[in-house]
């Protein structure tokens, strides 16, 4: 028969951010355990609140399947002596299998006879298997762990109760001194201890005791309650999914309500108001029909509507000091100038092994100028970029950012506009942090994008220069994310920047700007190059591009990230062409033979007087034309190279490359090396797998 099993782990209240990952982890571990134990099931339903993680497993089999196996033992010549008596080896083997020598059979394996015992292993009942779950539960990992009592067990929070029900029967086990049973706990304040009659009654039983255990149903209820409030008041709400998820994991019985605050606080910038309400109080902001913030908020309590007026007043009361602080910071911050804030950055450390934040800005200003000129920015754009680069961290020393660190960059833009900076300069101050995650929004302005690249590039080069290079999962300064951000910006903009060799250009620029750097920015340049190539691979692995295509295009002498990105995309776009295999095989044959020529390409000269066959002249003309036309894009270069396939085939048919005559041999190698050099702009095509 199909069985239903309920497992509930009751704990002291977990932090909201670990509730969802924890139930997902428990689900995965229990499912893996059951599969390893050969127990089948239909599906697993998840339940989670701040005080519990629960799984309802449907369609469990009654027991493990029995196993009949033939167990191989020692060879016959070892199992029996010369007189045919059983040896200790045979007796020991059968004893270990729970059998006797009378059960022995001989079977031939590759011409040698071996002892075999047919063994029947009866499957355990599902209840017996489920008694092994304590080891699964206690093996869970969490960002932070707690100990309690006089034991060594560590868990996210102390375990206070366990429910283990197979249909309507308790499956007994314990974790420390907590015995599994059928008693669960209702809502902390509205509920009470309650027994669950059978596993399928779990959700309804808790619902009757003021606990909505299903996360999705609880979240939908919160959304419905908030929607009702905003519809009644003709408001709009900022549906912040992260905030909704957090609130959902803070409550077991949600009740949404609206509160208000003094309209004078609406004079604060929207991001300040939103942060004060969202991050500190977990309030949802509301707006009028035109999108303007209103002096109201929506919150969610963990309880019912009893004494709701008192709850509303309490929430309104605790918000006032937050808004008062924000108003004070906002007013005080405007009493100083940007230059005064910049001066304070001399006492703010970027990193104690590298420099102050002020010195970082000086470096970034130089890097930004180098990048801006390479991108042919106008004089006005270069001036705006230079101004932004010299002040873009100033808000770090304001009181507002000191209190609300998440507003860095945002307050920089707001204050910069208040102090009269140009809009492009102010926007760049905010955008230089972008993207703030792997999928985060990219800078929308040209100045912001260049500043974002310059800032991240300085961080990467600086940390590499002092040998603080990410390894394994260790990346405390998020250098991988910053490098990935640079790659994404370049991909988005299509900018051609020789970033993989930029270090050699920056050091002289520092000297010209009379900026002293206490470390060698050229140090570990090869590692920096590899670091960026790995981020390019990461980008295209995420897009499910074939590994061999990525490996081919990143095994290159290119320094221009945009060209490498284009090479990957170009090869991927044409991989299914009818003649793709033929073209790649022709080019890779050229690449392989050209490796025998150790001379620098810059020194190679092809002498037409040494040609013996028409195909040599034809190859020479075709390659010369290809170089002369100097295709502007990687895709154009690749297309031009592919037109050479019949010429290459004819060339190899007519010519012995490694001719006995040294001059002829070197001339032919020179021809192939020059062509190989052109092909290497695409990448190492030899890495491609063609079928």
Curated annotation (Swiss-Prot):
Task: Report the top EC class in one word.
Answer: ligase
An example of a Gene Ontology cellular component annotation for this protein is: cytosol
Reaction equations catalysed: tRNA(Gly) + glycine + ATP = glycyl-tRNA(Gly) + AMP + diphosphate
Q: Which organism is it from?
A: Limosilactobacillus reuteri (strain DSM 20016) (Lactobacillus reuteri)
Binding partners and assembly: Tetramer of two alpha and two beta subunits.
Q: What is its EC number?
A: 6.1.1.14
Q: Where in the cell is it found?
A: Cytoplasm
Tell me what this protein is called.
Glycine--tRNA ligase beta subunit
Q: What is its main location?
A: cytoplasm
Family, according to the entry, reads as follows: Belongs to the class-II aminoacyl-tRNA synthetase family.
Asked whether the keyword Phosphoprotein is assigned, the reply is no
Spell out the molecular function terms from Gene Ontology.
arginine-tRNA ligase activity; ATP binding; glycine-tRNA ligase activity
The record's keywords, sorted A to Z, are: Aminoacyl-tRNA synthetase, ATP-binding, Cytoplasm, Ligase, Nucleotide-binding, Protein biosynthesis
One of the protein's GO biological processes: arginyl-tRNA aminoacylation
